[in-house]
Amino acid sequence: MVDQAYEPRLKSEYRARIRAAMKEQFAYTNEMQIPKLDKIVLNMGIGEAVADSKKAQTALKDLMAIAGQKPVATKARKSIAGFKLREGMVVGAKVTLRKDKMYEFLDRLVTIALPRVKDFRGLNGKSFDGRGNYAMGLKEHLVFPEINYDQIEQIWGMDIIVCTTAKTDQEAKALLKEFQFPFTN
């Protein structure tokens, strides 16, 4: 009996349909020119947790549940007296997703999390950085199914950066549209 290795839905869709659609749309001559997803970076600023390290731990735990891997605590580089901040205090958390976990997260983001956002009218299509990377923000981390609403102590916002190998914003937007990103413009 041959074991079938599990492959995420969006990864198999990319190989089967999206690569061909991108090659046809942009008339690439080489397979390696076709843009693909490189990584997804999740960043959660937890500046309110400076005074309470327990809040920082719950934020790290929530980000770990959302991402499926352990986040790195980002620390303050220098002290700022006005914010009661000391060098080395935890001020955020970040995690970088690659390979299968990246495709799994993207699938949950597009199919489950974004439709659960209050008053969601679509994503801003102008949030590209000029090099084919897309950045977006969420005001609440409660939209993810891994977070239990009853056990939440505080609502955190988060930044999501989708990095692609696309050379231009136009190519990156076409790639993300193929992945069913709901752009408004």
Swiss-Prot record:
InterPro entries: Ribosomal_uL5, Ribosomal_uL5_bac-type, Ribosomal_uL5_C, Ribosomal_uL5_CS, Ribosomal_uL5_dom_sf, Ribosomal_uL5_N. It comes from the Bacteria. One of its GO terms (biological process) is translation. Pfam families: Ribosomal_L5 (PF00281), Ribosomal_L5_C (PF00673). GO terms for cellular component: ribonucleoprotein complex; ribosome. GO terms for molecular function: rRNA binding; structural constituent of ribosome; tRNA binding. Keywords: Ribonucleoprotein, Ribosomal protein, RNA-binding, rRNA-binding, tRNA-binding. Signal peptide: none annotated. The keyword Ribonucleoprotein applies. PANTHER family: 60S RIBOSOMAL PROTEIN L11-RELATED. Belongs to the universal ribosomal protein uL5 family. This is one of the proteins that bind and probably mediate the attachment of the 5S RNA into the large ribosomal subunit, where it forms part of the central protuberance. In the 70S ribosome it contacts protein S13 of the 30S subunit (bridge B1b), connecting the 2 subunits; this bridge is implicated in subunit movement. Contacts the P site tRNA; the 5S rRNA and some of its associated proteins might help stabilize positioning of ribosome-bound tRNAs. Part of the 50S ribosomal subunit; part of the 5S rRNA/L5/L18/L25 subcomplex. Contacts the 5S rRNA and the P site tRNA. Forms a bridge to the 30S subunit in the 70S ribosome. This is Large ribosomal subunit protein uL5. It comes from Caulobacter sp. (strain K31). The gene is rplE.
